Every structure is written in C-alpha cells, then in structure tokens.
C-alpha cells in the first residue's frame, strides 16, 4: 500500500465551501444528485457525503440500495479532516438521513468541527415525511433530529408536516405554523424556513414562510402541478448557495424559490420525470 501513497502534501488539498450530507441516487435528481450540480453552478465547491445510496427513488417499479453503514459514514466524515480539506469550509447542509445513528455520528462530528470553525453555518433539512405520505423515514429519526441536530443548526427548512412532528403542534394554518416555528428558535437556531406554508389553492399559489425572532416574511410563488421529486433538495441547495454568496435570508429564499420554479418548468418542457438543470442565468 505504501507504494500507492502519492498525495501527502496537505497544503495542496482541494478545499470545500460546503459539505452536503444527504441521499444519493444512481439514477435521478434527488438528494446530492441534484444538490451538488446546483451548488457547483453557483461557483461553490461542495463535498458530498452520502447517507443512503440508492438505484433510484422508490417511485419506480424496481429499487435497490440502502443506508450507508455507520463505519463507512463516520469514515467519510473523518477522511475530510484527514485530507485537510475543510480549511475554508463555510457551511454544512443535511438532507435525508438513513438512520438515527448517522444523525448522532454527524452531530458529534459537527460539534468537533465547530471548534475550528466557530462561524460555520449549519443548515438542516429535517426530512421526515409530508402530509400526503406521513412519516417515510425510520420512526426513531424525528427524536434524533430533536436531540442531536436541531441544537446545532442555525437554520432549518421543514415542511408543514415536519414542523408538526418536530414541535408536536398543529400547523395547518399559517399563524399556527409561524407560532410553532418560533417555538423552535433559540440562541443557536436563528431562523426557520417553512417550505410548504399554507398557500392559496384557488389562486394556484404556494407560500414559504421565513421566521426569525424579530420578523416573519411570507413569500408567495406560483404553484406548478407536477410529481417531480427532489425539488426540496434543489431549494436547499439554492438557498445555501445564495447565503454563501452574500444574499440576505429573505432574498436568498425568494431567489431559491424562483430557481426551483424555473427548473421545474424547464424539466416539464423537456418531458422528463427527473429534474433537469438549465444553465444558471444569474452569476
């Protein structure tokens, strides 16, 4: 093995702006399979850490793969530090997690990482389920989010259903959802972006609520009728990219929503069941 050791000059290590921890598929455009190209389109470098590796989403007639073993998962995280690839790290994002033990491992890694990066932005998309499907992750994941990841996050991006699960509060109207989001805020958790706040079905609108301790901003977007998967992952990728490029939170949320709409319409025009990224018009 020693004869294969070529790269031990850590001063030459490739550096990341973002570490993205979430699912990966061989076929399709969900999780890091859509987030990584979207982030790179924004001129940012990202390292992808998979939590599950799947052939495709379960919405096809065949489906293979599963959660990454804990030993591998912890090794992926540890290797980034062993390669000295995190000197310029600015943010860590999380999406679909395979197991509660992964969440605990990730939280321990983030806690240690923050000692060297006190300004690190940690953004958690607490993927648990949705109103139509209910909980579609393992039943011990919601408590793992509450116990391990929420205390570390500066921002989270739940949908209405996930907000209900995390808070134990009914969130089916906008005021109750905002109140529930505010109940999660802390000295660490500065903002909650509710990605499916109550919209106007008749006017074909959907709403995103940006909630912080001193403000609430509700952003409306056109509703696109589609079964496309991965739009939430794309939204989070665009949001973190906007924040790292210096956009204010409300502006970054607004621009992320517009980009998702653009991608969805572009995908529909190309008659694809999987998201297709058009060129990024704005630098």
UniProtKB/Swiss-Prot annotation:
<dbReference type="InterPro" id="IPR004625">
    <property type="entry name" value="PyrdxlKinase"/>
</dbReference>
<dbReference type="GO" id="GO:0008270">
    <property type="term" value="F:zinc ion binding"/>
</dbReference>
<feature type="binding site">
    <location>
        <position position="59"/>
    </location>
    <ligand>
        <name>substrate</name>
    </ligand>
</feature>
<feature type="binding site">
    <location>
        <position position="23"/>
    </location>
    <ligand>
        <name>substrate</name>
    </ligand>
</feature>
<feature type="binding site">
    <location>
        <position position="195"/>
    </location>
    <ligand>
        <name>ATP</name>
    </ligand>
</feature>
<comment type="similarity">
    <text>Belongs to the pyridoxine kinase family. PdxK subfamily.</text>
</comment>
<keyword id="KW-0862">Zinc</keyword>
<comment type="pathway">
    <text>Cofactor metabolism; pyridoxal 5'-phosphate salvage; pyridoxal 5'-phosphate from pyridoxal: step 1/1.</text>
</comment>
<comment type="pathway">
    <text>Cofactor metabolism; pyridoxal 5'-phosphate salvage; pyridoxine 5'-phosphate from pyridoxine: step 1/1.</text>
</comment>
<keyword id="KW-0808">Transferase</keyword>
<dbReference type="GO" id="GO:0005524">
    <property type="term" value="F:ATP binding"/>
</dbReference>
<keyword id="KW-0067">ATP-binding</keyword>
<feature type="binding site">
    <location>
        <position position="125"/>
    </location>
    <ligand>
        <name>ATP</name>
    </ligand>
</feature>
<dbReference type="InterPro" id="IPR023479">
    <property type="entry name" value="PdxK"/>
</dbReference>
<feature type="binding site">
    <location>
        <position position="162"/>
    </location>
    <ligand>
        <name>Mg(2+)</name>
    </ligand>
</feature>
<keyword id="KW-0418">Kinase</keyword>
<dbReference type="GO" id="GO:0000287">
    <property type="term" value="F:magnesium ion binding"/>
</dbReference>
<feature type="binding site">
    <location>
        <position position="157"/>
    </location>
    <ligand>
        <name>ATP</name>
    </ligand>
</feature>
<comment type="function">
    <text>B6-vitamer kinase involved in the salvage pathway of pyridoxal 5'-phosphate (PLP). Catalyzes the phosphorylation of pyridoxine (PN), pyridoxal (PL), and pyridoxamine (PM), forming their respective 5'-phosphorylated esters, i.e. PNP, PLP and PMP.</text>
</comment>
<dbReference type="InterPro" id="IPR013749">
    <property type="entry name" value="PM/HMP-P_kinase-1"/>
</dbReference>
<keyword id="KW-0479">Metal-binding</keyword>
<keyword id="KW-0460">Magnesium</keyword>
<feature type="binding site">
    <location>
        <position position="231"/>
    </location>
    <ligand>
        <name>ATP</name>
    </ligand>
</feature>
<protein>
    <recommendedName>
        <fullName>Pyridoxine/pyridoxal/pyridoxamine kinase</fullName>
        <ecNumber>2.7.1.35</ecNumber>
    </recommendedName>
</protein>
<feature type="binding site">
    <location>
        <position position="233"/>
    </location>
    <ligand>
        <name>substrate</name>
    </ligand>
</feature>
<dbReference type="GO" id="GO:0008902">
    <property type="term" value="F:hydroxymethylpyrimidine kinase activity"/>
</dbReference>
<comment type="subunit">
    <text>Homodimer.</text>
</comment>
<feature type="binding site">
    <location>
        <begin position="221"/>
        <end position="224"/>
    </location>
    <ligand>
        <name>ATP</name>
    </ligand>
</feature>
<dbReference type="Pfam" id="PF08543">
    <property type="entry name" value="Phos_pyr_kin"/>
</dbReference>
<dbReference type="GO" id="GO:0008478">
    <property type="term" value="F:pyridoxal kinase activity"/>
</dbReference>
<feature type="binding site">
    <location>
        <position position="136"/>
    </location>
    <ligand>
        <name>Mg(2+)</name>
    </ligand>
</feature>
<dbReference type="InterPro" id="IPR029056">
    <property type="entry name" value="Ribokinase-like"/>
</dbReference>
<dbReference type="GO" id="GO:0005829">
    <property type="term" value="C:cytosol"/>
</dbReference>
<keyword id="KW-0547">Nucleotide-binding</keyword>
<feature type="binding site">
    <location>
        <position position="162"/>
    </location>
    <ligand>
        <name>ATP</name>
    </ligand>
</feature>
<dbReference type="GO" id="GO:0009443">
    <property type="term" value="P:pyridoxal 5'-phosphate salvage"/>
</dbReference>
């Amino acid at each position: 093995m020693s004869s294969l050791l070529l790269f031990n000059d850590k001063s030459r290590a490739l550096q990341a702006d973002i570490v993205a921890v979430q699912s990966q598929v061989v076929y399709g455009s969900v999780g890091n399979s859509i987030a990584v190209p979207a982030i790179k389109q924004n001129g940012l470098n990202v390292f992808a850490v998979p939590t599950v590796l799947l052939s495709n989403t379960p919405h096809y007639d065949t489906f293979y793969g599963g959660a990454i073993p804990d030993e591998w998962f912890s090794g992926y995280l540890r290797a980034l530090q062993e390669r000295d690839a995190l000197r310029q790290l600015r943010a860590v994002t999380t999406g679909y997690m395979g197991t509660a033990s992964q969440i605990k491992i990730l939280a321990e890694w983030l806690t240690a990482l923050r000692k060297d990066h006190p300004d690190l932005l940690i953004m958690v998309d607490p993927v648990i389920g949705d109103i139509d499907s209910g909980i579609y992750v393992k039943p011990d994941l919601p408590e793992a989010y509450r116990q391990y990841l929420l205390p570390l996050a500066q921002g989270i991006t739940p949908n209405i259903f996930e907000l209900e699960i995390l808070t134990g509060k009914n969130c089916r109207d906008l005021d109750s959802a905002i109140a529930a989001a505010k109940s999660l805020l802390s000295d660490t958790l500065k903002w909650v972006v509710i990605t499916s706040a109550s919209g106007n079905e008749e006017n074909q609108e959907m709403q995103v609520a940006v909630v912080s301790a001193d403000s609430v901003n509700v952003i409306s977007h056109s509703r696109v009728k589609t079964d496309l998967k991965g739009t939430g992952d794309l939204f989070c990728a665009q949001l973190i990219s906007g924040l790292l490029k210096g956009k204010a939170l409300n502006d970054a949320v607004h621009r992320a929503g517009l980009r998702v709409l653009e991608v969805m319409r572009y995908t529909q025009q190309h008659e694809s069941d999987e998201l297709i990224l058009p060129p990024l018009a704005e630098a």
